[in-house]
Amino acid sequence: MSHPVMHTDFPGLKLLARGKVRDIYDLGETLLLVTSDRISAFDVIMNEPIPDKGFVLTEISSFWFRQMEDIVSNHIISTDVDEFPAACRPHADLLRGRSMLVKKARPLPVECIVRGYVSGSGWKEYQSSGSICGISLPPGLRESDRLPEPIFTPSTKAELGTHDENISFERMTELCGRELAEQARDYTLKIYGRARELADQKGIIIADTKFEFGVFEGELIIIDECMTPDSSRFWLKDDYRPGGPQPSFDKQFLRDYLEGLDWNKTAPAPALPAEIIAKTAQMYREALSRITGISL
């Protein structure tokens, strides 16, 4: 286990943006994405890092990007630090295993969410309206039930510290243009369809996940991350019992802990006990091992 990385600051490299988890550097023709060990919940960044989290997210994303290359191109140029531009070499030790050299795409202003099961905020919305994001669903569904077909439920991409908002597909077409919106929706459903078949063979249920897309040289490509414990809800197939919440190995463990606190879900975040940090790190490593076969 390496020393946790909360923030990066590389002399000689231009920091373009610092997101909830990733630090993005502008290398001119390309971008350098560095995945820290930060973790957020309810759109608030916690004060403590989760050891090895950056490695886990990078490896899992790389795995899924490779699996989907015949469906949609992705933004990765290389994950091998030795192939990065010379300006990155002095920082190779810190970059190794947690960074990607990527194409400079123009991101769509939406997050592309696909749900295969009724869970989380979708379950709350279904209980009150019988629908999720305006999509009517059959009556009588229980929490964590599998949906007859996966549904596409886009959201806005909120600024740091604010909350994403679910939007209709028609609103997405207004924001992105109909052609790009339809492409992103179709890619999202195809990727999810393949991923859940592959995950099923590994004893994993992908209940829902989200993707981001961008335009590079006139082509819509998938960017950011791909089906990680940060962006997905992973359940164990052997433990699946619809009718209530499911044991998961993703960020839900941390969310559940925070739900039990007297905290208003706005910054500043509460301090995380050592055992919660350790258990969260264990969940992330288990996701890596089950999905890719790689152990840390």
Swiss-Prot record:
A biological process from GO: 'de novo' IMP biosynthetic process
PROSITE patterns hit by this protein: SAICAR_SYNTHETASE_1, SAICAR_SYNTHETASE_2
InterPro entries, per database record: SAICAR_synt/ADE2_N (IPR028923), SAICAR_synth (IPR001636), SAICAR_synthetase_CS (IPR018236)
Pfam families linked: SAICAR_synt
Transmembrane segments: none
Pathway(s) of this molecule: Purine metabolism; IMP biosynthesis via de novo pathway; 5-amino-1-(5-phospho-D-ribosyl)imidazole-4-carboxamide from 5-amino-1-(5-phospho-D-ribosyl)imidazole-4-carboxylate: step 1/2
Ligase listed as a keyword: yes
One GO CC term, this protein: cytoplasm
Keyword Protein biosynthesis among record annotations: no
Matching CDD domains: SAICAR_synt_Sc
Superkingdom of this protein's organism: Bacteria
The enzyme's E.C. designation: 6.3.2.6
Reaction(s) catalysed by this chain's protein: 5-amino-1-(5-phospho-D-ribosyl)imidazole-4-carboxylate + L-aspartate + ATP = (2S)-2-[5-amino-1-(5-phospho-beta-D-ribosyl)imidazole-4-carboxamido]succinate + ADP + phosphate + 2 H(+)
A single GO molecular function term of this UniProt record: ATP binding
Family according to the record: Belongs to the SAICAR synthetase family.
Annotated HAMAP family: SAICAR_synth
Protein name per UniProt: Phosphoribosylaminoimidazole-succinocarboxamide synthase
Organism encoding this protein: Pelobacter propionicus (strain DSM 2379 / NBRC 103807 / OttBd1)
